[in-house]
């Protein structure tokens, strides 16, 4: 079920028929491309899609820091920060800010001023969790608002999952795990007693270039529903071991890691699971529900800004980066064609058709909630909306003003209400015993 939002789409389409046609002449196309000097561009473009970044880039310049008083005492912490004005730094809401090569982390609050003349914005600093901001020159804005469950206000169990690529760290957070006194008091006031925890677990799958910390924003909702949550790492995400080729599978390979996480949940008391996925994590969850041997345990999917149509998404980024369509087509072949995929370092080609779900809407068997910002300029929302129009099992809830996977950051109350309401209506978890607590940090 979709909510209507009409945005323009590129006129030229990278269709399955186009891809198939290029595949039939891959050798000839590559020869011509090399002659024209475009093969190198296509290879670079394709590798940008499947090669994991070595480390996140601190791409936000820090212009100045503000203090609560003009007389700055030694050790006094700044209360505001002036940074470059970008689409992301201008967005409303609360965000994390990494600095000092990731060693430092602070929570930034709402925008307090925008200075268009020098293209900067000022945001409040809610809390500095670690590091010294006094001399920083650059940082990285992120949707992550807590880097571990303790920072989010919850007790967690550190576990290891035995993935096909090796042991990988994960957190397990059981119901009633809040450590924050205010959170506990809100729960106690709203609930006549401690509820029995649900026998449904939530398996949390982060997106491309992110880590499991991205998924901690869902803790408030899963705790309200009495769900145990498992926040996993997976191959090539800088926490879990790399795969043999060290390449993203865009969901085509990573689902095997989620299969192991489901096994763990079932072996530790779960009778069923809900998969939560952000961005590429949404693609991974869709593949898991389609292919995993334990897929019958999956009750529902909850997806945030998911990448659901890789053919359209690659075409979109071809257009966004002003790359000629023929080079984008060749880049697709370097991912999908056995004769060319070695150019990207892939051990095996990826079937983009299999992970482009609007073309496979009839194969969906699990109730799916999709939350996606209509202002997402990195993974556009249209495939999410289209999938809801094509499948009666899919519900689409649009958000506004949120950059990619920042739906929670822009409107945490709507995110909480949407998730708890949708899952409760399907008798998943216990009924929420409280409204979302107002403690920022998850």
Predicted regions and their residues:
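Catalytic histidine-centered segment of alpha/beta-hydrolase-like enzymes
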Residues: 402-416, 431-434, 441
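Short beta-strand/loop motif that positions the catalytic acidic residue
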Residues: 363-365, 370-372, 376
